[in-house]
């Protein structure tokens, strides 16, 4: 490998290289510890239940991704055409909240709305109709929660792409008399296609590594995913051999998916930075579909927020504020969040700056060495999906177990 380009690379690139490669080394070390533990125990595990869990994990992740991407794309298309209505700005801003919302808060909100004693059940009792029953649990509950968290994220990202469509393209499609479907296929879909594929891979990985949602709403071992199965093997059964096997499968599958997702570029140089202005009204049928889509989604998305706020307003905050456990948890959360966010931002800026340097022919010589390091840095940015937090914690548990022994 030719490293001559390193002599021309700015010294400011070194922190990014150190940060990115450190993350990869950490992931490889965790995998090595898990593998060594498995090799020491012989990996004498019945593979039938492991394959069954893997099949269920792929199934729910694939179905969740399909539903999330379909709803997200439809909502983004609807919002891009319906530019003016009361609360549009608030709704678009609210779409970004799902990615920072704690998973358990989302689960509690969905249960408060769709649970056996939730708002929907009370509304059904009021009108004498059948309630949702256990709809929010099992596979339907898992899918519902995944769509609730991921569809807004998809819609927000795709809406930004649609808003950057040059007005000339829209003017040309209108002058040609294209139907809404033909306009979408010829003008709008090419603008969001690359983003759509990249987002699909990301959403699939998020659903594949889902833990809290499956644990709380799964309702049955039949719907266990790999992460939940690892948790049960360690926490409930202390079957380390099975946990090691599941963790190895999880890391290998996720790493392969991350490599595949990294190959999908999320860029399109043909788009401008102009704001889209809707000057040509769509046919009545298309407008009705857009309005109905926005209304149903707004009701589905906002009602769990309101349920959480309503339930929280009825809480005994006076007693909570005087509990020592609450004070300890609050201080711990603030300290961990502050330190983690500061370290994360610093490492992200360093990795991003180094990756930009490695991709610039004016700063480095573009050869196999620079491209390899650039690919490794891209992989390090998605390492949290390749080695999920539960698997990482399991690896640390094995390390601590060896040290204490």
Regions found by a protein language model. Name each.
Residues 1-12, 186-189, 279-283:
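Short, Lys/Arg-rich N-terminal segment immediately upstream of the first membrane anchor
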Residues 171, 179-183, 268-281, 316-321:
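Juxtamembrane inter-helical linkers in multi-pass membrane proteins
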Residues 44, 161-162, 186, 216, ...:
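Short alpha-helical segment immediately N-terminal to, or the first helix within
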Residues 1, 238, 260-285:
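Intracellular loop-helix junctions on the cytosolic face of multi-pass helical membrane proteins
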Residues 2-6, 40-47, 185, 316-321:
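A short amphipathic helical element positioned immediately N-terminal to and/or at the very start
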């Amino acid at each position: 490998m030719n490293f001559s380009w390193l002599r021309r690379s700015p010294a400011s690139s070194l922190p990014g290289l150190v940060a990115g490669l450190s993350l990869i080394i950490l992931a490889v070390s965790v995998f090595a510890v898990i593998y060594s533990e498995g090799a020491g125990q012989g990996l004498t595990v019945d593979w039938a239940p492991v394959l069954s869990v893997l099949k269920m994990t792929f199934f729910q992740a694939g179905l969740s991704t399909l539903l999330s991407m379909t709803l997200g794309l439809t909502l983004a298309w609807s919002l891009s055409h319906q530019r003016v209505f009361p609360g549009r700005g608030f709704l678009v801003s609210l779409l970004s909240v799902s990615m920072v919302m704690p998973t358990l808060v989302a689960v509690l909100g969905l249960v408060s709305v769709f649970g056996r004693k939730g708002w929907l059940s009370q509304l059904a009792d009021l009108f004498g109709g059948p309630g949702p029953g256990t709809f929010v649990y099992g596979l339907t509950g898992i899918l519902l929660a995944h769509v609730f968290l991921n569809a807004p994220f998809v819609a927000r990202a795709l809406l930004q792409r649609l808003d950057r469509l040059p007005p000339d393209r829209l003017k040309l499609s209108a002058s040609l008399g294209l139907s809404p479907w033909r306009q979408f296929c010829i003008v709008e879909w090419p603008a969001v296609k690359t983003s759509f594929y990249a987002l699909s891979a990301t959403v699939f990985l998020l659903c594949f590594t889902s833990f809290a949602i499956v644990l709380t709403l799964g309702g049955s071992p039949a719907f266990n995913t790999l992460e939940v199965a690892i948790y049960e093997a360690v926490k409930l059964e202390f079957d380390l051999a099975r946990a090691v096997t599941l963790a190895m499968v999880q890391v290998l599958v996720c790493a392969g998916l991350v490599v595949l997702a990294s190959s999908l570029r999320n860029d399109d140089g043909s788009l401008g930075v102009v704001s889209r202005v809707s000057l040509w009204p769509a046919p009545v049928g298309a407008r009705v579909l857009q309005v109905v889509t926005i209304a149903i989604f707004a009701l589905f998305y906002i009602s769990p927020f309101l349920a959480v706020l309503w339930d929280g307003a009825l809480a005994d905050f006076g007693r909570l504020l005087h509990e020592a456990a609450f004070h300890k948890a609050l201080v711990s959360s603030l300290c961990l969040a502050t330190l983690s966010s500061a370290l994360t931002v610093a490492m992200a800026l360093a990795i991003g700056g180094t990756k930009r340097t490695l991709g610039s022919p004016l700063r480095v010589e573009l050869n196999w060495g620079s491209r390899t390091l650039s690919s490794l840095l891209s992989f390090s940015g998605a390492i949290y999906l390749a080695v999920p937090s539960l698997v990482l914690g399991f690896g640390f548990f094995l390390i601590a177990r060896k040290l204490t022994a």
